[in-house]
């Protein structure tokens, strides 16, 4: 199932993806912006307006601005992740593409006078032209699974005993978000998956059901790093909330059997330890 809306759709690189419904401009209330992060490895005059954390492996669909001349758009820069950003003057950058040192009118890119410098962290805040229903990918996954499992018209009709959902890394985080939203029950109340294997997903989720969501985004700050982390209810000392990843499914049933598998990388940066830790004390969760 193609569930991600912004996968490459070029002649050179085409992947199975989702063509989602779009939210009309009049329905996008209140008016909001999206954040797009750029962390250059070398001096560059311009970048495509898309996720760059996987470099040339990505080539995600560019996200063009609604108004290329919007004075409310911002370009921020900082030297380290947690320091306060500096705002770059609006007259020093444009939503255009550069050929050499010359900007041309193509609004799928951002151009900065003097270039984007390596080692710095840039954040672009702007209102996109299009607003895909990003979460439709989760419903497509559930409904396709349900169709193949239960419907008479399914090519596998009568031959399905169990269905296992397996995902690695981003797809594992997709499955964790799927469970957190309580989506394992189809429209007739039947379970889509009997089991879920989320591999190297750590304790995170992702931008899979948000306005202007970028499903491949990993770096902080991002929706994927938000509480809750563990399956069972935890107390979060920062927000004062008590919640668990599977709270919705514990109420609605159809909870699949779940396996999480992680490597040391997920403990260093994937927040995996938060899945089985008391957040206030650091002790093992009960």
Task: List where the protein language model places each region.
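C-terminal His-loop and adjacent cap/lid subdomain of alpha/beta-hydrolase
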Residues: 1-286
